[in-house]
Amino acid sequence: MHILVVSVNYRTAPVEFREKLTFQATELEQAMTTLQKQKSVLENVIVSTCNRTEIYAVVDQLHTGRYYIKKFLADWFQLEIEEVAPYLTIFEQDGAIDHLFRVTCGLDSMVVGETQILGQIKDSFLEAQQVKATGTIFNELFKQVITLAKRAHSETTIGESAMSVSYAAVELGKKIFGELTDCHVLILGAGKMGELALQNLYGSGARKVTVMNRTLSKAEIMAEKYMGHAKPLSELQCALLEADILISSTGASDYVITKEMMTKVEKMRSGRPLFMVDIAVPRDIDPAIDELEGSFLYDIDDLQGVVEANRAERLKEAEKIQFMIEEEIVLFKTWLSTLGVVPLISALRDKALAIQSETMESLERKIPTLSDRERKVISKHTKSIINQLLKDPILVAKEIAAEEGADEKLALFAKIFDLEMEDVESRAEEVEHKRAWTPSVPSL
């Protein structure tokens, strides 16, 4: 089995391509279910955010897995593989494990050290579990990754000076206007990104804020928290007439604001400029609007320069976290290496318990006057003897599993204890394809 990551992210692809490969939240479960049926894929988790779409997979063959995951992406988004391939980055084995740790800890984010990605990774993992797209390997790996990310943020200061994308959008507005107290700000979208933007706006002194959303009640709830006003999306054109700054993050699949709409609006704004920050992927605002004289449009990729603040300080903390990651990778690989010995240990235990059971039956035939209590006491003590006898051999088997040439040594181990290899291999298949185990996931 191999661990594989297929990634398209802000480093490798511009926003105009990333938006073509963005999974909507409502389709993630179906996407993971479909991917799980692809040849070579044994487990999978799909993560899709404004800055990345990534497929994490356990595959039985690397070459086959790579091909079918690329094909899945192309088919799902109705593109040709040749269109998708140039923008993809592939991580395998140790590189894939390291990448997952780095992403979840915020080290691979546009804003180094941000914590939003941790919640997004956890949510994607839980959805994958719900549709039975994860198994023994990813259940253990993601649990370990989420735990480490929480520890990294609590034991370092990397998150204290990190900006979110929403914060960067507000900072851009402050660079343009200075004080935001007298600015009319329009927020499109009442999701997490929109609320973070509104929270940062309020903290920066903005009080003339309007929130718009397809569901008016959500906009009203969000606006009320920060002394803003809510309006239905049907009044968008009127709201654009009043706004000085627009921050948009709706999650819509099509443009919410078109060039045609803004052309009409500009004619009624009497030459007043409108600064628009589109942090949605797919984008909410038609990029052609930037051609208009009075509209100044920035997308999520344009925020890169803004988020450089305090970067040097955060990179020092990132080095500490990378060291923590390397330690965790060693622990995970040790666990992974012993996974193959589990069926062998199980077979050894079963054989010992079978002997104990036969011994108890023989004893009951020879001493039929034994009471129930006496039987239980004898059974308990004979099982205790078995556990004591097996303790050292099991520890040795686990150590052997982590060594080079483990297969030959474990085969000798099985021969010493007269274990049938066919039974062991059958158990190995059961472990490999196990889907039922669901570990507890650390809370955020």
Curated annotation (Swiss-Prot):
InterPro entries (alphabetical): 4pyrrol_synth_GluRdtase, 4pyrrol_synth_GluRdtase_dimer, 4pyrrol_synth_GluRdtase_N, GluRdtase_CS, GluRdtase_dimer_dom_sf, GluRdtase_N_sf, NAD(P)-bd_dom_sf, Shikm_DH/Glu-tRNA_Rdtase
Sorted UniProt keywords: NADP, Oxidoreductase, Porphyrin biosynthesis
UniProt site positions, description: Important for activity: 99
EC main group: oxidoreductase
Catalytic activity: (S)-4-amino-5-oxopentanoate + tRNA(Glu) + NADP(+) = L-glutamyl-tRNA(Glu) + NADPH + H(+)
Pathway(s) this gene product operates in, as recorded in its UniProt entry: Porphyrin-containing compound metabolism; protoporphyrin-IX biosynthesis; 5-aminolevulinate from L-glutamyl-tRNA(Glu): step 1/2
Gene3D superfamilies per record: Glutamyl-tRNA reductase, N-terminal domain, NAD(P)-binding Rossmann-like Domain
Annotated binding of NADP(+), by residue: 189-194
CDD domains (alphabetical): NAD_bind_Glutamyl_tRNA_reduct (cd05213)
Pfam families documented for this protein: GlutR_dimer, GlutR_N, Shikimate_DH
List of catalytic residues: 50
Listed GO MF terms: glutamyl-tRNA reductase activity; NADP binding
Keyword Oxidoreductase among record annotations: yes
GO biological process, one term: protoporphyrinogen IX biosynthetic process
Family classification: Belongs to the glutamyl-tRNA reductase family.
Domain statement: Possesses an unusual extended V-shaped dimeric structure with each monomer consisting of three distinct domains arranged along a curved 'spinal' alpha-helix. The N-terminal catalytic domain specifically recognizes the glutamate moiety of the substrate. The second domain is the NADPH-binding domain, and the third C-terminal domain is responsible for dimerization.
Function statement: Catalyzes the NADPH-dependent reduction of glutamyl-tRNA(Glu) to glutamate 1-semialdehyde (GSA).
Subunit structure: Homodimer.
UniProt-recorded name of the protein: Glutamyl-tRNA reductase
The organism's taxonomic lineage, starting at the top: Bacteria, Bacillati, Bacillota, Bacilli, Bacillales
